[in-house]
Curated annotation (Swiss-Prot):
Residues binding ATP 2: G466, S467, T468, G469, V470, G471, K472, T473
Record InterPro entries: AAA+_ATPase, ATPase_AAA_core, Clp_ATPase_C, ClpA/B, ClpA/B_CS1, ClpA/B_CS2, ClpA/ClpB_AAA_lid, ClpA_ClpB
GO cellular component assignments: cytoplasm
Native organism: Mycoplasma genitalium (strain ATCC 33530 / DSM 19775 / NCTC 10195 / G37) (Mycoplasmoides genitalium)
Chain spans, region NBD2: 416-618
Gene Ontology biological-process entries: cellular response to heat
GO molecular function: ATP binding; ATP hydrolysis activity
Domain notes: The N-terminal domain probably functions as a substrate-discriminating domain, recruiting aggregated proteins to the ClpB hexamer and/or stabilizing bound proteins. The NBD2 domain is responsible for oligomerization, whereas the NBD1 domain stabilizes the hexamer probably in an ATP-dependent manner. The movement of the coiled-coil domain is essential for ClpB ability to rescue proteins from an aggregated state, probably by pulling apart large aggregated proteins, which are bound between the coiled-coils motifs of adjacent ClpB subunits in the functional hexamer.
The protein, known as: Chaperone protein ClpB
Length: 714
């Protein structure tokens, strides 16, 4: 049997097939312009102009703009803004996945790569390859069974001789992990370190892209939105880099407005629903034959008909108004796109030396379109347009940040202002007798919410000092529930679980080489998922000193690195640590001695970083009676849900106080006493059938015994 096999692509131009011609994309205006980064582009040009080792590799963190710098260089090539030796060069982005795809037979991959390299070599420097994620060439194409070489080893000789030019891009981590390990490959490339741009540089880059976003999304982007995107992404998104994270915010906010513009306005939608409801009612009444002859039915039907006609008229008017607004706005965007297209043609004609066509565009077409655009914008600005939003402002950016991080950044609504102003009153309903402690915490929260606090530290950090059972943990729970409408916003760590030295690994993750390295730390992961929360470190004095050392960085800078090197942002957390240290002195009213015991236990650098040490008062009798009434009210509320009604006599409150309260143990024994003595008695009566649903009962103390009797009124 004869098998004739011709390798796929024998006479094909693989470079055109699997490469992306960036020059063509720039000419077709498919590539976004780059503003700034002049030093990096100049360094790229200098390396490409060398005789040997003329292969630059751009190294930087993800999102800093490595690929954009290459595209910026290509834009300069297209506009002839480069030295003579680099004019007319073509830059192809090589797809490594396309290179290896379909190479079924041994030697086919090597033939394909050699065909491409031969074409690049024969171009005499007219073709430059760009390989994004260049670290992937190490090992790509190698097959242990056949002994084939990978791309890196195929490229090395040609790179060394300067026969081909390659631009690479990769991250610092992957460069170190793959390319630095191969010394021969590393020395054939010249590194260009791409740093994250400053906030001002990122803002300049975004201002250059603003027009492209506006044309793509058919919206208007205010400059305040660009400033807000840079500032908010810098402050609230720590895991990513500028300008990528700021660009993402603008793009998402613009997409949100675009989606709203594409759908019907809320005003029209609600009118349509109202019309459907009335039409359904009208049809149902008309089909009802029972009351056909009644005058009231006829009058009501006529009233419904008039109401429907008025609503339909209003709907049609709104739809026409909406369509007109939309048409006017689309006309503005159409003119902007035409101006953009003419600008691209102008650049092309100028680079080609076609000055006749360029002058026609520059002095005739563009001025005419700009005049039309100005007229259309004035007309749109003076007309009423309330049906849909067409602008992206800082509010939309804040909304996107809030959705992605859970941090409330939208402008304070009146309802939220009232909530913050009455925050202390709400918490005082739950936590009794600790007004000073509550006020200290609430004032810090208010400062943080209106952005007066230091932006590089947590919202606030406190040590709650007091004897057991005085409300330290309860205050933290109340704060989470009142502030975030959810007690789950409280992230609690019982520090009795962190008494050993190695417990630090539980908080930030195990170090490399240890079991559990791939898993995240409990503290760092919890804050990454819920960046706006209350952190409670209960009984902090029980933790090992090394555990408290981890908190030093959090309290000072508002950040913490986990075991995998990721920086976690604690700047939107409220940190509360509770402690029973010196509680015996606080019972005697000796605060100075309580602080001395705190200073003996914790290091000065730890205490110095805490915003405030909050003392919890010893519970007075009136406060304890108020707590008892509150606990009985909670019990009554639970019973009411089962249609069981109980009234608690005043002598019961006094009896519970005398039987259960002890200054040394605080309020906790009271809850236990109510559960054991009152709730248990009610449960037994229910099981015995002595309690009926819907009937009221009175619980009182008779001769030091708790009794349940039916109310006379029942």
């Amino acid at each position: 049997m004869n098998i004739n096999f011709t390798p796929a692509g024998e006479n094909r131009n693989f470079l055109q097939e699997i490469g992306r011609n960036i020059n063509d994309e720039v000419l077709k205006n498919k590539v976004d312009p780059i503003i700034g980064r002049d030093n990096e582009i100049r360094r790229l040009i200098e390396i490409l102009s060398r005789k040997s080792k003329n292969n630059p590799v751009l190294i930087g963190e993800p999102g800093v703009g490595k690929t954009a710098i290459v595209e910026g260089f290509v834009r300069r090539v297209v506009s002839n803004d480069v030295p003579l030796n680099l004019r007319d060069v073509e830059i192809y982005e090589l797809s490594l996945s396309g290179l290896i795809a379909g190479t079924k037979f041994q030697g086919e991959f090597e033939k394909r790569i050699n065909t491409i390299l031969k074409q690049v070599k024969e171009s005499n420097g007219r073709i430059i390859l760009f390989i994004d994620e260049i670290h992937q060439i190490v090992g790509l194409g190698r097959n242990s069974s056949s002994g084939a070489m990978d791309i890196a080893n195929i490229l090395k000789p040609m790179l060394a001789r300067g026969e081909i030019k390659v631009i690479g891009a990769t991250t610092l981590k992957e460069y170190r992990e793959y390319i630095e390990k191969d010394g021969a490959l590393e020395r054939r490339f010249q590194k260009i370190l791409i740093n994250e741009p400053s906030s001002q540089e990122a803002l300049t880059i975004m201002r250059g892209l603003k027009t492209r976003w506006e044309l793509f999304h058919n919206i208007t982007i205010f400059d305040s939105a660009l400033v807000a995107a840079v500032e908010m992404s810098t402050r609230y998104i720590n895991e990513r880099n500028l300008p990528d994270k700021a660009i993402d915010l603008i793009d998402e906010a613009a997409a949100k407005i675009k989606t709203e513009m594409s759908s019907e306005p809320v005003a029209i939608d609600s009118l349509k629903r109202e019309i459907i409801n009335l039409e359904t009612e009208y049809a149902a009444l008309k089909q009802d034959k029972e009351n056909d002859n009644k005058q009231s039915k006829k009058e009501y039907l006529e009233k419904l008909k008039k109401q429907l006609d008025a609503l339909k008229q209003k709907r049609d008017s709104l739809i026409n108004e909406w369509k007109k607004e939309k048409a006017d706005f689309e006309n503005i965007n159409k003119l902007k796109k035409e101006i953009e297209e003419f600008q691209t043609k102008l650049e092309t004609y100028q680079s080609e030396g076609n000055y006749e066509s360029a002058s026609k565009i520059l002095y005739s077409d563009i001025p005419r379109l700009k005049k039309e655009l100005e007229s259309a914008q004035q007309k749109y600005a003076t007309s009423k347009h309330d049906l849909f939003k067409t602008e992206v402002s800082e509010n939309e950016i804040a909304e996107v940040i809030s959705q992605t991080t859970g941090i409330p950044l939208k402008k304070l609504l009146e309802s939220e202002k009232d909530k913050l102003l009455h925050l202390g009153d709400e918490i005082k309903k739950r936590v009794k007798g600790q007004d000073e402690a509550i006020d200290a915490v609430v004032n810090t929260v208010i400062r943080g919410r209106v952005n007066i606090n230091d932006p590089n530290k947590p919202i606030g950090s406190f040590i709650f000092l007091g004897s057991t059972g005085v409300g330290k943990t309860e205050l933290a729970k109340s704060l989470a529930e009142v502030l975030f409408d959810n007690e789950k916003a409280l992230i609690r760590f019982d520090m009795s679980e962190y008494m050993e030295k190695h417990s630090v690994a539980k908080l930030i993750g195990a170090p490399p080489g240890y079991i559990g390295y791939e898993q995240s730390g409990l503290l760092t992961e919890a804050v990454r998922r819920k960046p706006y929360s209350v952190l409670l470190f209960d009984e902090i004095e029980k933790a090992h000193p090394d555990v408290t050392n981890v908190l030093l960085q959090v309290l000072d800078d508002g950040t913490l690195k986990d075991s995998q090197g990721r920086v976690v942002n604690f700047k939107n957390t409220l940190i509360i640590m509770t402690s029973n240290l010196g509680s015996n002195f606080l019972l005697e009213g000796k605060k100075d001695l309580a602080i001395q015991s705190l200073k003996k236990h914790f290091r000065p650098e730890f205490i110095n970083r805490i915003d405030e040490i909050v003392f919890f008062n010893v519970l007075e009798k009136d406060t304890v009676l108020s707590i008892i009434n509150s606990l009985l009210a909670q019990l009554s509320k639970r019973l009411n849900k089962q249609n069981l009604f109980f009234n608690f006599d005043s002598n019961l409150t006094e009896f519970i106080y005398k039987s259960s309260f002890d200054q040394q143990f605080g309020a906790r024994p009271i809850k236990r006493f109510i559960d054991h003595s009152v709730a248990t008695l009610i449960a037994k009566y229910i099981l015995q059938g002595k309690i009926k649903k819907g009937v009221g009962y009175n619980i009182a103390v008779v001769k030091d015994n708790i009794t349940i009797t039916q109310n006379n009124k029942s």
